[in-house]
Amino acid sequence: MIGKLVRDLKIPDQRHPEKAHRPDNVQPKKPSWIRVKAPTSEGYKETRDIIRGQKLATVCEEAGCPNVGECWSQGHATMMIMGEICTRGCSFCNVATGRPQALDAFEPGRVAHAVSQLGLKHVVVTSVDRDDLEDGGAEHFAQTIRAIRHRAPATTIEVLVPDFLKCGPSALETVVAARPDVFNHNLETVPGLYPEVRPGARYFHSLRLLQRAKELDPSIFTKSGIMVGLGEDRQGVLQVMDDMRSAEVDFLTIGQYLQPTPKHHRVDRFVTPEEFAGYEKAAYGKGFLMVSATPLTRSSYHAGDDFARLRDARQKRLGA
């Protein structure tokens, strides 16, 4: 872990070569509601050892998630498949950019083994973008889902997928056909900020991906999230909510953007807890089954508990 931190701090240009030419953005001091304790618990160490033992990557580490100490201490980790190197270079993201290695055919089995070792009731599996692959890694996702089902049949599975922008429709169909319990794809920000924040993606393509997943399997829960503090305004966030609901998204997450390095997109401002509470109220008013909107909310934060509440919310709505 220490070696990894040293790598990230000493040679950021190797991790993010596409950002090396950018001027440094001043990182504002974090308010009290953002600060978290350093991970030190035995549970954290046990989770780390299992992940290391299976030679797996986690988005918790690669993206520099502020909740890693809390989640890992409880034995929760978000598996990141298909390597640690992404083919995109989004200005908000701390995952390394470059040329990925070939897929590891044994990775799905190792993920399933780790899920079993950790005793997870709910697992989140995500990935880097793999624009170098014809199917964007869809079959690898499907293999991972099937491996977890075989090894840990009682575990519910959530996938947080890339946009499959350069693939045919069969990529999405492959993932949905593997029957994950939750299909998650993040819109990340308001459409007006895409050219700067998410230049390799297309807002309405991502929105349609979520809509089509629900069309392919109406029983699947769909989920999406955005960050705030990137330069958006409240009306833009409310419009994204409306767009998601038009695509029948069930679960919305909203969290504060935190700038990984001075070369990344600047933090425009820190959104207050009161504003997050306002977003949560507005989202429930628009019909979302489940909403998580706090400064430290991330896609997989408390995902297991939230899935149970999501399932209950659907049952109540169907029974109403």
Curated annotation (Swiss-Prot):
Its cofactor is [4Fe-4S] cluster. Keywords: 4Fe-4S, Cytoplasm, Iron, Iron-sulfur, Metal-binding, S-adenosyl-L-methionine, Transferase. Its EC number is 2.8.1.8. One of its GO terms (molecular function) is metal ion binding. Binds 2 [4Fe-4S] clusters per subunit. One cluster is coordinated with 3 cysteines and an exchangeable S-adenosyl-L-methionine. Residues 1-30 are annotated as: Disordered. [4Fe-4S] cluster 1 binds at residues 60, 65, 71, 300. GO terms for cellular component: cytoplasm. The keyword Metal-binding applies. [4Fe-4S] cluster 2 binds at residues 86, 90, 93. It catalyses: [[Fe-S] cluster scaffold protein carrying a second [4Fe-4S](2+) cluster] + N(6)-octanoyl-L-lysyl-[protein] + 2 oxidized [2Fe-2S]-[ferredoxin] + 2 S-adenosyl-L-methionine + 4 H(+) = [[Fe-S] cluster scaffold protein] + N(6)-[(R)-dihydrolipoyl]-L-lysyl-[protein] + 4 Fe(3+) + 2 hydrogen sulfide + 2 5'-deoxyadenosine + 2 L-methionine + 2 reduced [2Fe-2S]-[ferredoxin]. It is found in: Cytoplasm. The keyword Disulfide bond does not apply. Gene3D superfamilies: Aldolase class I. Its main location: cytoplasm. Residues 72-289 form the Radical SAM core domain. Belongs to the radical SAM superfamily. Lipoyl synthase family. PANTHER family: LIPOYL SYNTHASE, LIPOYL SYNTHASE, MITOCHONDRIAL. NCBIfam families: lipA (TIGR00510), PRK05481.1 (NF004019), PRK12928.1 (NF009544). This is Lipoyl synthase. It comes from Cereibacter sphaeroides (strain ATCC 17023 / DSM 158 / JCM 6121 / CCUG 31486 / LMG 2827 / NBRC 12203 / NCIMB 8253 / ATH 2.4.1.) (Rhodobacter sphaeroides).
